[in-house]
């Protein structure tokens, strides 16, 4: 993603990034400072990719009549552990997508990966370390560790989210109305975040991201 050369940081973390005191995304997360400017992500993760998952027309009735807007849902990630999901609305499609990309950058998080399948003992971070479940609305998504080389056994929306997070092999189980792209993406993203809830023995006595 292109970095805005004219950016003037307004937050403490943004100033630290520009000054070079925070040089990586790991350091930014460990600092404990909130990420409130998308340009911070542009500087620290220059290889970040974005993809539009869904564009939908939404309507709202007001005193002056019916108001129509477009809602965009976007996933961003560097295919190496960092992933973010965002959505935004605007009267035009282009601005809605740009706002959703910025929202996804501000929601970016690090997903721990591992080799959690009993069928595989390669030790490489290619799948989830253990079974996790995420929910959004009526949709429930369960991610199950898979052996290396299997690929991503999931629906189209979930596959896009998992690929951006750097997950290469995984089994999935889904329940609910998965035709809802927004809830399907949110449930998958929530499942990825559940990986960070449990502290693994390998991290005992060490700093976690």
UniProtKB/Swiss-Prot annotation:
GO terms for biological process: translation. SUPFAM superfamilies: dsRNA-binding domain-like, Ribosomal protein S5 domain 2-like. It comes from the Archaea. GO terms for molecular function: rRNA binding; structural constituent of ribosome. Gene3D superfamilies: 3.30.160.20, 3.30.230.10. Pfam families: Ribosomal_S5, Ribosomal_S5_C. One of its GO terms (cellular component) is cytosolic small ribosomal subunit. Coiled coil: none annotated. Keywords: Ribonucleoprotein, Ribosomal protein, RNA-binding, rRNA-binding. Residues 48-111 form the S5 DRBM domain. The N-terminal domain interacts with the head of the 30S subunit; the C-terminal domain interacts with the body and contacts protein S4. The interaction surface between S4 and S5 is involved in control of translational fidelity. Part of the 30S ribosomal subunit. Contacts protein S4. With S4 and S12 plays an important role in translational accuracy. Belongs to the universal ribosomal protein uS5 family. HAMAP family: Ribosomal_uS5_A. This is Small ribosomal subunit protein uS5.
């Amino acid at each position: 993603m292109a970095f805005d050369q004219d950016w003037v940081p307004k937050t403490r973390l943004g100033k630290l990034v520009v000054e070079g005191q925070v040089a990586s995304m790991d350091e930014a997360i460990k600092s404990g400072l909130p990420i409130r400017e998308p340009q911070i992500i542009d500087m620290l993760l220059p290889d970040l990719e974005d993809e539009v998952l869904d564009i939908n027309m939404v309507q709202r009735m007001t005193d002056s009549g019916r108001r129509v807007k477009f809602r965009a849902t976007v996933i961003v990630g560097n295919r190496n552990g960092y992933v973010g999901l965002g959505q935004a609305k605007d009267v035009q499609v282009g601005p809605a997508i740009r706002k959703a990309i910025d929202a996804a950058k501000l929601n970016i998080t690090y997903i721990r990966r591992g080799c959690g399948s009993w069928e595989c003992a390669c030790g490489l971070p290619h799948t989830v370390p253990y079974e996790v479940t995420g929910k959004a609305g009526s949709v429930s998504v369960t991610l199950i560790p898979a052996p290396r080389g299997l690929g991503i056994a999931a629906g189209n929306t979930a596959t896009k989210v998992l690929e951006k997070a750097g997950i290469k092999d995984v089994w999935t189980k889904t329940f609910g109305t998965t035709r809802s792209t927004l809830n399907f993406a949110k449930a998958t993203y929530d499942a990825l975040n559940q990986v960070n809830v449990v502290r693994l023995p390998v991290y005992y006595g060490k700093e976690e991201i």
